[in-house]
Amino acid sequence: MPNALTLESMSPSLAKVAERARQEPEAQFHSLAHLIDVTALKRAFDRQRKDAAPGIDGVTKADYGQDLERDIQDLHERLRTKRYRHQPIRRVYIPKEGQPGKERPLGISCFEDKIVQDALREVLEAVYEPDFRDCSYGFRPGRSAHEALRTLNQVLFQGEGNWVLEADIASFFDQLDRSQLIEMIQRRIPDGSIKRLIGKCLHVGILEGEERTTLDQGTPQGSVLSPILGNIYLHHVLDRWFEEEIQPRLRGKAGLIRYADDFVILFQRQDDAQRVLEVLEKRMARFGLHLQPEKTRLIPFQRPPREQKGGKGPATFDFLGFTWYWQRSQKGHWVPRCKTRKARLQRMIDRIYRWCRTHRHQSIPAQHSALGRRLRGHYNYFGVNGNTRSLAILDKQAQRAWYKWLQRRSQRTRLTEERFVDLLRDFPLPRPRITVSIWGT
């Protein structure tokens, strides 16, 4: 997804909309479509990635930019006169995390459609960003998964997460009810042109090989627009409901932490947790959503007794690619810790192994550069306090995979361990390191 905008980087017109939305939570915006002008479309063009996969028309950013002024003017005229048509998206499949052999669909829009989606996202964000609650961290300016992890660590450390409700919404982006989504948006933005444009981005054909289909529900995964539409939906379905209707009725403290459609709810009291678990499925069903029974559970996560000498705490739970557990600190106190989820770590090891095998005949500098990018990306996300062991495992396995497949480049000259050590001096792989602090405030 392109970078979300801050108030300072918005156009003056959008900044006024955002400021009014902040000051008047009940205000309605009847006329916003004119904000998707030539300048807004150019901004959206600039935010697109150069290396993004093309849609069914094969057009890349470089292709579209060859005659940018003409193409943007033409696009704006089609939008203004309501002649714009969203082209079908190209469907591909990527592996599903933690479920070997299973895949999830991803939709790739044509480049021009990405521009329209991003310009529309910019308008929706100006209105809804002031509305969104602090419990929401995904795809929002100034917020991140690391911020969600930091909040989670703080709540657990303070003893306010004795019970953790770990929930998984089944195929959220596929099951989202479009009619209810449009109704939610209409309450804040009763602008017919915006409604029609969102509809065109949702009711879009899907091209899979030679077969074309049209889905009646959900929002295409991979769409530039899907993250904010998902946030708007869950803002109404979950965030507001929990903070306004559920929290005031609980006997102890409780908190929701959500990143896109991934969320946990933490409770001080078991009875509160059980009551919420009972009503959560009914709440989701009202909006066409369902929780996966095998992935939705209530986990006891109390801090172990001070007198407990060894071992770890009670059960563990997973959130945003990490497994959370209790561990003794160097000072002897029980503290919450997290490590890379086992399935996520193994998936990364397998990817590196396959990459080294497939690309073993490339030059050493080319392999070194590509491996370095993959490892740095992993360390930048998973390099949080206390996760050094998982990072070290990946480092060791990456070196082992590279050595194994470099050995098999040639039948005549075998790469010895000594020569591989020398090679690593000239082409060192990135060292695992802690890149993000999630401890403290």
Model segments located where?
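A glycine-rich phosphate-binding loop feature that marks nucleotide/adenosyl-phosphate handling sites
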Residues: G255-Y259, T296-P304, A370-R374, L391-Q399, ...
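Non-catalytic, polymerase-adjacent accessory regions of viral genome-replication enzymes
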Residues: M1-G58, A62-E69, Q73
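Core structural elements
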Residues: I36-K42, P88-V92, K96-G98, L202, ...
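Conserved polymerase palm-domain catalytic core
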Residues: R78-L79, R83-Y93, D131-Q302, T316
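A terminal-accessory region detector
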Residues: T388-T441
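Duplex nucleic acid-engaging cores and interfaces of nucleic-acid transaction enzymes
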Residues: G107, F111-A119, A145, W163
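Short, solvent-exposed helix-loop connector elements
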Residues: P105, S136, T214-T219, P336-R337, ...
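A conserved non-catalytic segment of reverse transcriptases
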Residues: H203, G209, L291-Q362, R376
